[in-house]
């Protein structure tokens, strides 16, 4: 696999068997938006590709569960820190399951690594990288000769993103420990960690060595990832990661989607209108490094492309596909899956991979038209679809449930009742009533398909 490193702007070959990946996760003070979803889905695809080709992957995605935004939420809501963070961690994980994002091997929470953070600050203090102000302990960026080597920018370009509310030695200096009487007792003074320190301590505790891949949104490159790299370089005496990957923004009306800009489109809102697999397909439909503007029509088109996958699956009577063995050894046998893996090995070229998937579905349907009773052909296509589902992370649902998605329990009961009435009318040769029921259901965007095994129904989405 070759991946474009955000730092060197060059494709770096990843030819190890064992791969370590750390993905910066959410700050858990509110529901997750599509920007969070895109980061998780893009790097879940990376993980799936590595697993599918036999790599052993150690994957961590953290939770920032102590932060100024969470404290503000505490003040507004009257809830405790634990009540807020537990609620939104559960909410986030529900969203990830809906998007078929594999559960990480490690899900560290910042509050569980306070001792590790303090140990890191001690190392930095011992070597003269810190100083103390009235509100906390700061990292002196002027002492790090390689500071800004990650983002490769002049500091002047980034000043607008930095806070200088206190008299720091340098505008780029950042807080390691914030004094706060309400939190952790230690030799530096009661307080809580700075955001940039949290990730370094968690990475050091879990992985101990230089990461193969550090991933996150492009907005984290500076200052967050720059400051992480500085602490690891100066405190742990090693490079934090060999490859840095950053996904592009999700935009709404040309603006970056952000909770702070109050233009977030929450995952839960999207899931009310579209199933998780359709949303996943949409979020994967452009290259992970590119920005894309949220568009309802593009999301609808992604759903139509996914429909074609399920139409072929339904034609083969292929039921629910298990996602379980993707985390174990899965053997890729089909030629199409091997071709798609080869494409995705080039910096996750997902647009090209999905185009090849579209071509495969069209070709498979043509072959089935010619040889509808060829059992070997059907079995080969079934195996290919199963392998492709595990690589892309969609296509697992039972086809009947897929095409009935979005119908409430009450609506389902009414539909089934009308189908029984129609079946009885047909038995009694009352075709006018049978046709009237079909038209009644069609007006409610329900289409009927009469088969040798009875009548089945689907929801019409267009």
Swiss-Prot record:
GO MF assignments: ATP binding; cysteine-tRNA ligase activity; zinc ion binding
Any one biological process term the GO annotation gives: cysteinyl-tRNA aminoacylation
List of residues binding ATP: 259
Record bears the keyword Nucleus: no
Motif, 'HIGH' region: chain positions: 26-36
Subunit relationships: Monomer.
Record-given protein name: Cysteine--tRNA ligase
Organism: Campylobacter jejuni subsp. jejuni serotype O:23/36 (strain 81-176)
Gene that encodes the chain: cysS
